[in-house]
């Protein structure tokens, strides 16, 4: 059997650089190398692209993926399908955060006319920006917690007014979040005005736009979605924390979380969550994969929190474990995602790009 040529892209110029490398390690160790020939492209923190061909060995340490011993390559040469480079059946971007999960890299693949795993430009960019995402959810009629949003320039000019708005509209605790980051980078739980100001200063180090959300005493429930025009969902899973909130350190450093799969919820609540996950998927025009995150209160009130257009594949990650519970193994999940990328690419080829006069 002729192997399909796959290129995995990871790293990136983002605060989530290390998370991306960890995700790449998991995917590289899970992908079926009898079916796929796998090349990798590592993007450094400075934005340089480094490529290695035909990865066959197990990656035992993430340091093995930090490529420093090859020359920086031209992007078009590394990826193009013409005479400048190898023809790839699909590219698998495992980039988290800005410059990778926000539609920018997807736009590059579109221009180069290469099939790629995951969401397109619109879905990736709207899922990355928490404010845009919330506005799309609101238009779809999905229930959300109260929030406000503002820019760094607005806060510098109207700090007192914005603090007053938070105090008037929301009640403590609140969560301060950069609008365009994931993996809980830059997020703070604030219990009073002093902590609020500190949290705002922290979050503005990572983004020019913030979202401040109402805190709630609720369970954190997640649903995985897989597919293109006819997506499927998993039974929900629950993030059980031994910390105040599910931040970057507890996710990737301390291991102070547990994933309960499936979550202990009434059947009707589980079905509602699955249906809402599909609605969120459609609201942002997603394709390939999404993880939809929810809050569920003790009286079974459900609020959508966000969708993650490129959920992690680390040992702690919910997305692959939710599909494992449904009977879909890591290798089969990866193969399915690659097939979905090719399916979407073939569908796009049906579009006309010139007008017949």
From Swiss-Prot:
It is found in: Cytoplasm. Its main location: cytoplasm. It comes from the Bacteria. Residues 134-339 form the ATP-grasp domain. Mg(2+) 2 binds at residues 306, 308. GO terms for biological process: cell wall organization; peptidoglycan biosynthetic process; regulation of cell shape. Its EC number is 6.3.2.4. One of its GO terms (molecular function) is ATP binding. Belongs to the D-alanine--D-alanine ligase family. Cell wall formation. This is D-alanine--D-alanine ligase. It comes from Staphylococcus epidermidis (strain ATCC 35984 / DSM 28319 / BCRC 17069 / CCUG 31568 / BM 3577 / RP62A). The lineage of its organism: Bacteria, Bacillati, Bacillota, Bacilli, Bacillales. The gene is ddl.
């Amino acid at each position: 059997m002729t192997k399909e040529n796959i290129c995995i892209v990871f790293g990136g110029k983002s605060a989530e650089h290390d998370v991306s490398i960890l995700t790449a390690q998991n995917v590289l160790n899970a992908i079926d190398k009898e079916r796929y020939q796998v090349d990798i492209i590592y993007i450094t923190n400075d934005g340089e692209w480094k490529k290695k061909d035909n990865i066959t060995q197990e990656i035992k340490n993430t340091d093995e993926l930090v490529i420093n011993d090859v020359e920086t390559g031209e992007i078009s040469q590394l990826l193009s399908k013409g005479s400048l480079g190898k023809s790839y059946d699909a590219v698998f971007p495992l980039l988290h955060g800005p410059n990778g999960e926000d539609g920018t890299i997807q736009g590059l693949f579109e221009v180069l006319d290469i099939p790629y795993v995951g969401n397109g430009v619109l879905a990736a960019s709207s899922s990355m920006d928490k404010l845009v995402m919330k506005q799309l959810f609101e238009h779809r009629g999905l229930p959300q917690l109260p929030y406000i949003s503002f820019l760094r320039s607005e806060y510098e000019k109207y700090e007192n007014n914005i603090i007053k708005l938070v105090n008037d509209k929301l009640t403590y605790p609140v969560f301060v979040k950069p609008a365009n980051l994931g993996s809980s980078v830059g997020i703070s739980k604030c219990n009073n005005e002093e902590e609020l100001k500190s949290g705002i200063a922290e979050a503005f180090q990572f983004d020019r736009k913030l979202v401040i959300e109402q805190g709630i005493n609720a369970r954190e429930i997640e649903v995985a979605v897989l597919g293109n025009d006819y997506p499927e969902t998993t039974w929900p899973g629950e993030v059980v924390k031994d910390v105040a909130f599910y931040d970057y350190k507890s996710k990737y450093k301390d291991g102070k979380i547990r994933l309960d799969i499936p979550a202990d919820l009434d059947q009707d609540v589980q079905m509602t969550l699955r249906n809402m996950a599909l609605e969120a998927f459609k609201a942002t025009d997603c394709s390939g994969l999404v993880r939809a995150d929810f809050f569920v209160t003790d009286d079974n009130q459900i609020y959508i929190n966000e969708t993650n257009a490129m959920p992690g594949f680390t040992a702690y990650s919910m997305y692959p474990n939710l599909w494992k519970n449904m009977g879909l193994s890591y290798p089969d999940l990866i193969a399915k995602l690659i097939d979905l990328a090719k399916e979407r690419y073939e569908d796009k080829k049906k579009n006309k790009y010139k007008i017949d006069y």
